Swiss-Prot record:
This is LL-diaminopimelate aminotransferase. It comes from Prochlorococcus marinus (strain MIT 9303). SUPFAM superfamilies: PLP-dependent transferases. Pathway: Amino-acid biosynthesis; L-lysine biosynthesis via DAP pathway; LL-2,6-diaminopimelate from (S)-tetrahydrodipicolinate (aminotransferase route): step 1/1. It is an enzyme of class 2 (transferase). Keywords: Aminotransferase, Pyridoxal phosphate, Transferase. Pfam families: Aminotran_1_2. The gene is dapL. Pyridoxal 5'-phosphate binds at Y72, S108, K109, Y132, N187, Y218, S246, F247, S248, R257, N292.
Length: 408
């Protein structure tokens, strides 16, 4: 009989969001008339920008002609999209990133997991706690951890707590690590990093030969012009960091799938024999072998994000969701609930009232307010006693959800 990858058996009972879906399904079957409002999983609700839709329609029509048909495209992405990304998202902000260092993909979730393919299994890994579950679970699946303890922490990982007491800013690891995941604006807490804070991380990484995997999926939601959007705005980051970006949240591409990863040329790791190896070469080889590229139609839609019309429309989308976040913050604060985040990110991170545990508060909101959120403990042991609400919903639903919560 074929053997399975037993590392999967080390995973906790269910990935956070499937467990939420299971509880919602059970509740809905018992209460079919309940009008649920979902402020849980970070899926967008507003339509794709018109500029993107029109570009995709043109691309579809092109695909219906002999001269305009496109089959397999470059695994790294079409040059015109990579050039638009490099210019707008990096070069215009003073970052020395060129188009060849951009790898277009179908999601930053995939990339942040797949990047492990090119990194050795003996690397010592650090994550914040709470943390986006994919970072941890993908390492468990790849056999890079031991078993989980009673609190859900896996042997072999270094956990860096972030909480209200430390301003949701992780401290530099006290033990040696080789690889660290950073996410700013942070999912789930909504915290942001200043230039000085990121410079401290970059300095640490360069001094200690650490690779930073930097998730900037929510950079478009930053409201303060003094805050960095990319780690490459920080001196020395090209030598120690890979960055993940996505069109999912700023342009509504959760259902159309387009993202990109930045791997600077000259960024190096060590081989088993101690020689230096460029990570760009390994990632390029990995993508060429395991990925067939994002469809031409979708990439044309993503390219339209960088048009004048597209920029105006995605800015409007971001403003809409950030207004929702402001409403959630205001109403929860008025209800006497301690809130964090929601100022530079579409997530509000709240302290559960009355010392309720995270899943207890989830069930409380589900059954008594018919509102769905995300329990903080699902993001890690340090998330216990916290809860995440997402600003990704209609204004009507956000207003109604807040009315229901305040009525509890």
């Amino acid at each position: 009989m074929v053997q399975v990858n037993s590392n999967y058996l080390k995973l906790k009972a269910g990935y956070l969001f499937p467990e939420i879906a299971r509880r919602i399904k059970s509740f809905s079957e018992a209460n079919p008339d309940a009008a649920l409002i979902r402020l849980g999983i970070g899926d967008v609700t507003e339509p794709l920008p018109l500029a993107c839709r029109n570009a995709m329609k043109v691309a579809i029509d092109e695909m219906g002609t002999n001269t305009g048909f496109h089959g397999y495209g470059p695994e790294q992405g079409y040059d015109w999209l990579r050039e638009a990304i490099a210019k707008h998202d990096f070069q215009n902000k003073g970052c020395q990133i060129n188009a060849e260092e951009i790898f277009v993909s179908d999601g930053s979730k995939c990339d942040s997991s797949n990047i492990l393919d090119i990194l050795g299994s003996s690397n010592r890994i650090a994550v914040t706690d709470p943390v986006y579950p994919v970072y941890v679970d993908s390492n468990v699946m790849a056999g890079r951890t031991g078993e989980a303890n009673q609190s859900g922490r896996y042997a072999g990982l270094s956990y860096l707590p972030i909480n209200a007491e430390n301003g949701f800013a992780a401290k530099i690891p006290s033990e040696p690590v080789d690889l660290i995941y950073l996410c700013f604006p942070n999912n789930p807490t909504g915290a942001v990093a200043t230039r000085a804070q990121l410079q401290e991380w970059v300095n640490y990484a360069r001094t200690n030969s650490v690779l930073i995997l930097f998730d900037a999926a929510y950079e478009a939601f930053i409201q303060n012009p003094d805050l960095p959007h990319s780690i490459y705005e920080i001196e020395g980051a090209r030598e120690c960091a890979i960055e993940f970006r996505s069109f999912s949240k700023n342009a509504g591409f959760t259902g159309t799938r387009c993202a990109f990863t930045v791997v600077p040329k000259g960024l190096k790791g060590k081989s088993d024999d101690g020689s230096d190896v460029e990570l760009w070469n390994l990632w390029n080889r990995r993508q060429s072998t395991k990925f067939n590229g994002v469809s031409y139609i979708i990439q044309r839609g993503a390219e339209a994000v960088y048009s004048a019309q597209g920029q105006g429309e995605i800015n409007a989308l971001v403003s809409f969701y950030m207004r929702n976040a402001a409403i959630i913050r205001r109403e929860l604060t008025a209800a006497g609930i301690e809130v964090h985040g929601g100022e530079h990110a579409p997530y509000v991170w709240l302290k559960t009232p009355d010392d309720m545990d995270s899943w207890g508060f989830f069930d409380h909101l589900l059954h008594n307010a018919n509102v769905v959120g995300t329990p903080g403990s699902g993001f890690g042991a340090a998330g216990e006693g916290y809860f995440r609400l997402s600003a990704f919903n209609s204004r009507v639903n956000v207003d109604e959800a807040m009315r229901r919560i305040r009525a509890l």
